[in-house]
């Protein structure tokens, strides 16, 4: 896992938490939770790829891992749309920078998960 990606996730989560304190938006809290979940899932897939023998463990532990993978891609698409929507509607430069970084990170993570999943298939 790229250390820049880890720090990017942490930075964006901290920034979103600051925005949440100012706006008390429940939707933003949901986005933060999904970002954290997505990071954990990506990390697990990355670890499974590093230890290719874990593919069988992954499949036996979760017989529906392809279905779960599909669900994660849907979550990523939803997050991308939500971030784009918020980016269009915000006038705060702090929020614009945060959402632009979040969008870039989501696209990078989507590509990483695709790469990991192809290696596992």
UniProtKB/Swiss-Prot annotation:
Question: Where's the motif Nuclear export signal?
Answer: 12-21, 85-94
Annotated GO biological processes are:
exit of virus from host cell nucleus through nuclear pore
**Gene3D superfamilies listed in its UniProt record:** 1.10.287.230
**A single GO cellular-component term on record:** virion component
Q: What does this protein do?
A: Mediates the nuclear export of encapsidated genomic RNAs (ribonucleoproteins, RNPs). Acts as an adapter between viral RNPs complexes and the nuclear export machinery of the cell. Possesses no intrinsic RNA-binding activity, but includes a C-terminal M1-binding domain. This domain is believed to allow recognition of RNPs bound to the protein M1.
User: Subunit structure, briefly?
Assistant: Interacts with protein M1. May interact with host nucleoporin RAB/HRB and exportin XPO1/CRM1.
The name of this protein is: Nuclear export protein
Gene behind the chain: NS
